[in-house]
Amino acid sequence: MKDDNKILKLIYTFFLGLLLAIFIGIGTNTFYESPTAPTYPIEVKNNNGELTDGQTALQVTYENKMETYNNKTITVYNRNVSIITLSAATILLVLSLLLKKKKIKIITDGVMLGGLFTLIYSLIIGFSAQDNNYSFIAATVGLIVVLYLGYHRFVRQQK
């Protein structure tokens, strides 16, 4: 019977962490909406034969807008989302250290796991920003936060 309780606590902790990461991801998308991609011109869509000069101009304009969208707009958006979620992950991980003092182990572990899942999400989004400098900084911050958390949660606890 006691083993069933341990399994249930483990599942609850994992589920809480997963829900926190999902909450932060959806919250970020809700309050910081992604940019809208350019729409393909209808005049070019309905063409059955060769493109006219006007349609060619529309096609070139659309391709230029898509290039700007893919190379600049969405890259900046992904970097900003990564910054927001990295901050949220750090807050969750610090909160898990503070909750540890309250002796609420199952909640503390769930919050810590949520922070780690959010950190992973943040790094993945950061990599899609295609900025090596930012990716390196984000990975460094993540590493420092995880090392600090690990020390305070596991090493310092044993002393």
State the predicted function of each range.
Residues 1-35, 143, 150-157:
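Hydrophobic secretory-pathway targeting helix
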Residues 75-88:
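N-terminal membrane-entry
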